[in-house]
């Protein structure tokens, strides 16, 4: 991800406690059973609401091989990287976030996961257990800011 792309989407990385016996295949199974994905891939869950056209995705990624990425994502004494990520684009109406984060919260709770949130204003460097609505509010604020900047740069009017 180059920096430009990073500002276009909100990405979360999921971790489990070191002593957890949760497997990647169990996480994949949970997503398959709880989401209606339009993706043919068995490593991506792309969820879309046809009525509102809201969408988000989960991906199962290969373990990092790049030194810098290993340093960032694999180096936590208490947590193991599940290699699952969540993605929601910015420049979207607020209800996109409401739709997506309702499921994200359930996913974290049901599987006892922790979240590395690079967009966090309080702790962008460590996996945490987010409070209710914390991720949605974080996305929503960042989305508003990015949208306003985008529309200003394009000389378009943007109504909050």
Regions picked out by a protein language model, each given a short descriptive name:
Residues 1-7:
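Short, Lys/Arg-enriched N-terminal segments with co-localized hydrophobic residues
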